[in-house]
Amino acid sequence: MAALVAALLIRATDPTASYVARVADRSGRAGAVLAGALVAILITHAVAAVAGFFLAPHLTPNPKRLFVAFALLAAASGGIWPGKPIEPGEGRHPFWTVAARLTVGGWSGRTEFVTLALAMSGTAALAGIGGFIGSAVVLGVAAIGGDMVWRTLPHRAIGIVLGGLLAVAGFWLAFSALRLI
């Protein structure tokens, strides 16, 4: 459940959603774009969950909690200070274009980093599934709605509010892991 909520909050402020919306709008093939996005996030969240599963036995509970706190704070910084938008580029096959771009970009993604951290501190499979579902909901809305719908949302305000929520949760976990509260 934590991974699902975190993925919803983080992916809503992520440049990948606007990228998916732009490619779906330009290509006119929202289904292919959404399928490519789903394949990419399935791969990246599965790898994050498996990596978290194998890293978990090597850490005690407080470092695991501190790792989750660091992941949430990194995600909060991306929400408060938005990154550069991803340019759609020219691709003839929107499925492969989106799948490749999101898979390669997912290795440094904030959502996948939080999924990795949550997989280390709990049930890895549920963290991977939750991260996938949360990301799929946001990217599905972006692909089906297209660029015109996605552009009308107040992204700056959403980023500040969601980034603030993630920062509060991250600081709370960090202070808890350091036994300051």
Predicted regions, residues:
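Membrane helix-loop-helix hairpins that form the core translocation module of multi-pass transporters
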Residues: G28-I86, I144-W150, V161
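Juxtamembrane transmembrane-helix termini in multi-pass membrane transport proteins
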Residues: M1-F53, V114-A124, G128-F132
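Transmembrane alpha-helical segments of integral membrane proteins
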Residues: A17-Y19, A48, A136-M148
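Small-residue-rich segments of transmembrane alpha-helices in multi-pass membrane proteins
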Residues: A40-T44, F95-W107, I160-W172
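Alpha-helical multi-pass membrane helix bundles of inner-membrane/thylakoid proteins
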Residues: A74-G105
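Residue-level signature of transmembrane alpha-helical entry/exit and packing/kink sites
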Residues: A2-A3, V33, R65, P94-V98, ...
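Juxtamembrane boundary at the C-terminal end of a transmembrane helix
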Residues: F171-I181
